[in-house]
Amino acid sequence: MILFDMTQRSIQSARNFIPSANSYDANCRHLSMSMCRLQMTAEQIEAQIAQIKQDCQAQGLRFTALREQVYRLILLAAQPIGAYELLDLLQSASEKVVAPPTVYRSLEFLLRHGLVHQLNSSKAFFACSQPTDRHVAAFLVCRCCGEVQEFSHPSIQTMLTEVEQSTNFATQSIIIELSGICQRCQ
C-alpha cells in the first residue's frame, strides 16, 4: 500500500531519482568494515517505511504523513537530494501549498532519529543505510557522478571516543566526508 499518492507530473520529476532494483546491498549491516549504497526496490521501500512507522510508534514518536512523504522521496533518490528539490517534488504532488519550514521540520525529525544523513559539502540529504543501528559513518562522495557511499567501521567510533576523552570535548554532531572519485568513474 502506497500512502504517498503522486501526480503524473511529480512521477515524471521523480523518475531521475529512482535507482536500479538490483543495486541494493542487502548484506550490509555495518558490523565490520563495510560500504553501502542504499538503492532499494519499491517493495523494500514499503517494508522500510512500515518498519520505521512501527519503531516510531513504539517510541511514542509521530511519523506524520509529510515526514513519510519526505522520507519516501529521499529513499527514491538515486543521489543526495536538496531541501528545495524535495519541496518542488512535494508541491507538484499536492494540491496544497507546502511551506519550506514544514519540509525543514520533517528533515530535522528524520536527521535527529538517524533515518537520513545530510552532507556538509552540499547540504543535500540521503537515506541512512542502517537506520535502526546507531553508528558513526563516513561518506565517500564521488566528484564525478555525485554518488555517495556510507562507510562504517568500529575503529571510527573508537578513535572518536578516544579524541573526545583525551580532549574533554563533548561532540554534538559528527560529519565525515571524503571527496574523490568512485571506482566506476576511475
Question: Which positions does each model-derived feature cover?
Answer:
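C-terminal regulatory/oligomerization modules of transcriptional regulators
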Residues: 2-30, 37-48, 154-186
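Short alpha-helical segments that sit at the start of domains
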Residues: 39-71
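Short capping segments at the starts of secondary-structure elements
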Residues: 77-82
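DNA-recognition alpha helix
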Residues: 83-95
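Basic amphipathic alpha-helical segments that dock to polyanions
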Residues: 103-113
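Non-DNA-binding regulatory cores of transcription-related proteins
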Residues: 112-186
